[in-house]
From Swiss-Prot:
GO terms for molecular function: xanthine phosphoribosyltransferase activity. Converts the preformed base xanthine, a product of nucleic acid breakdown, to xanthosine 5'-monophosphate (XMP), so it can be reused for RNA or DNA synthesis. GO terms for cellular component: cytoplasm. This is Xanthine phosphoribosyltransferase. It holds the Pfam family Pribosyltran. The keyword Transferase applies. Belongs to the purine/pyrimidine phosphoribosyltransferase family. Xpt subfamily. Xanthine binds at L20, N27, K156. Its EC number is 2.4.2.22. Homodimer. The gene is xpt. It is found in: Cytoplasm.
């Protein structure tokens, strides 16, 4: 999506270790007008699927998942990284590794909010190694829910997460596909 690529070029910052900082408009300060456009783009790509639920992982995926929930007119569920007294033990659980944080998390979703009747669109801000998505897919599998598709804002195609998931048969739509970085700029895939 050209609009997202232009915004990345304008406000994104390339950090050492192949990290793209987009906190000026995606994952710290949020541009709601841009997010509405991004949600509309995901809707166009997945409108023919039977989506009745959107699933993401906290924290950075929540904002775009929420915008998509409005556009798809369906509930949004997010996998929590921390347990609470209100969540209880009746949860689907899995472990995910965060590339950015360089650590593993146990994530969980209450069994109240996901089951075999659900046709799920997975939404996240980044796809690199694919570990967060593998965790969400595992949670859907535990719930016997159907993964209808995966929507990603920014995919680092030089890392193999997207390729591996596509090989497993998942439909992934990434709005910006990055094939690499130079010292201070982003190289997008054509």
């Amino acid at each position: 999506m050209r609009k997202l690529e232009e915004r990345i070029m304008k406000d994104g910052l390339v950090l050492p270790g192949n990290i793209l900082k987009v906190d000026r408009f995606i994952n710290h300060m949020i541009d709601p007008v841009l997010f509405e456009d991004l949600a509309n783009e995901f809707y166009e790509k997945f409108k023919d699927k039977k989506i009745n639920k959107i699933l993401t992982i906290e924290v950075s995926g929540i904002a775009i998942a929420y915008a998509c929930g409005i556009r798809f007119n369906c509930p949004v569920v997010f996998a929590k990284k921390t347990s609470s007294k209100t969540l209880g033990d009746n949860c689907y659980r899995t472990e995910v590794f965060s590339f950015t944080k360089n650590r593993s998390y146990e994530v969980m979703v209450s069994k109240e909010y996901l089951d075999e009747k659900d046709h799920v669109l997975l939404i996240d801000d980044f796809l690199a190694n694919g570990k967060a998505l593998e965790g969400l897919i595992d949670i859907c599998s535990q719930a016997n829910a159907t993964v209808e598709g995966i929507g990603i804002l920014i995919e680092k195609v030089f890392q193999k997460g997207g390729e591996n998931l596509r090989r497993q048969g998942y439909t992934i739509e990434s709005l910006a596909r990055i094939k690499g970085f130079t010292d201070d700029s982003v190289i997008f895939e054509d």
